[in-house]
Amino acid sequence: MGKNITVLGAGAWGTAFGQVLADAGNTVTMWAKEQQIVEGIRDHHHNAVRLPSVEKLPDNMTATGDRAEAVKNADIVVVAIAAQFARVALVEFKGLIPDHAIVVSLMKGIERGTNKRMDEVVRESLDLPADRFAAISGPNLSKEIADRHPAATVVACTNLDNATKVAEACTTSYFKPFVTTDVIGLEMCGSLKNVTALAVGMARGAGYGENTAAMIETRGLAELTALGVAAGADPKTFFGLAGVGDLIATCGSSLSRNYTFGANLGKGLTVEEATKVSNGVAEGVPTTDAVVALGDQLDVPTPLAYQMSRVLNEGISCSEMLAGLFGHEVTGE
């Protein structure tokens, strides 16, 4: 039997995932602040602002701008808000979400200022126990999923039964979720790969080829794995869908906002210029400095994140970024 599921945030990924949930037989309510988006989904089953490629969203999707109305009957509440605004937005929902509901994060990022993962931000904001929090991450480019292309993802929760409940709620003929208890690993994969995607995109935009891209991706994977393990993650997570899988998709597609943002930097645009032409939030931009700070906190070197931080804050070129990745001494891989 289908569940009542609320999605907080009607951006491209939130809306695409709402469609997955509706296709899986659930009753889906989208919450958004923008009245135009609410009316579009509720009255016309169309999100012309954030996901115009889908001409008609399923009939079992609706929308509201009222927080209490959005979550009052929810069995599952999915959070799809820009990572750096999650804490402020979620505080408004504290006390409104039913005590039995599982809260699921689609967000990927490290909070600036606190260096906290999204599982920590969500649980603190809502005063939520660990067994009622789940995260979803994987190679999930929103437009392809909106077009119902075959895809897979990973659902993480410390309570495997609750992870399975969430996975069952989003299983369709084209969308296959797997489950894990490694919340930390999943969160770290989803956040840190965005920094790597910025760097790969920048290299591509600057005209570099496959060798350079492969170098950045593999060294980025090593960096994010080391950070994750230091934070308590299972290293195997980084070599599955949430790690390597997401890295491949995010670092190889113009549909990735982080890749595209980096490519624009590589072509010579400033951070301000690249931001203006971006369609949506490139989470890797605010996450980069947080990753460097997290590396300092965990005593893990983060040369790629550090060099991308210099790109974003000092305006160094792609060639300077790449030159700074490695020291002069020969080391083991």
Curated annotation (Swiss-Prot):
Recorded GO CC terms: cytosol
Xref: Gene3D superfamilies: N-(1-d-carboxylethyl)-l-norvaline Dehydrogenase, domain 2 (1.10.1040.10), NAD(P)-binding Rossmann-like Domain (3.40.50.720)
Keywords on record: Cytoplasm, Lipid biosynthesis, Lipid metabolism, NAD, NADP, Nucleotide-binding, Oxidoreductase, Phospholipid biosynthesis, Phospholipid metabolism
Active-site residue numbers: K193
Binding site for sn-glycerol 3-phosphate: K108, G138, K193, D246, S256, R257, N258
Residues that hold NADPH according to the record: W13, K33, K108, S142, R257, V281, E283
Full protein name: Glycerol-3-phosphate dehydrogenase [NAD(P)+]
Organism: Bifidobacterium longum (strain NCC 2705)
Top-level taxonomy: Bacteria, Bacillati, Actinomycetota, Actinomycetes, Bifidobacteriales
